[in-house]
Amino acid sequence: DRDSCVDKSRCQKYGPYGQCTDCCKKAGHTGGTCIYFKCKCGAESGR
């Protein structure tokens, strides 16, 4: 889920990050972005 992606995907302060995006996609989101070193998932896909 969204929170597990935050825990697994440490990242730079801002911008896209591969692990973050991949984690979010597996969780059913369209992708993810890094905000203040945390992975934030985008809108859910296919719902």
Curated annotation (Swiss-Prot):
Recorded GO molecular functions are: potassium channel inhibitor activity; toxin activity
| UniProt xrefs under InterPro entries | Ergtoxin, Scorpion_toxin-like_sf
| Top-level division of the source organism's lineage | Eukaryota
Q: Note the SS bond partners.
A: 5-23, 11-34, 20-39, 24-41
Which keywords accompany this UniProt record?
A: Disulfide bond, Ion channel impairing toxin, Knottin, Neurotoxin, Potassium channel impairing toxin, Secreted, Toxin, Voltage-gated potassium channel impairing toxin
GO cellular component term of the entry, any:
extracellular region
The subcellular localization recorded is: Secreted
Tissue expression, as annotated, is:
Expressed by the venom gland.
Write one Pfam family the protein is assigned to: Toxin_17
Q: Does this entry carry the keyword Hydrolase?
A: no
- Report the principal subcellular site: secreted
| Similarity comment: family membership | Belongs to the ergtoxin family. Gamma-KTx 5 subfamily.
Q: What does this protein do?
A: Reversibly blocks Kv11/ERG potassium channels.
Query: How does the record comment on the protein's domains?
Result: The presence of a 'disulfide through disulfide knot' structurally defines this protein as a knottin.
Q: What is this protein called?
A: Potassium channel toxin gamma-KTx 5.2
Which species is this UniProt entry from? Centruroides gracilis (Slenderbrown scorpion)
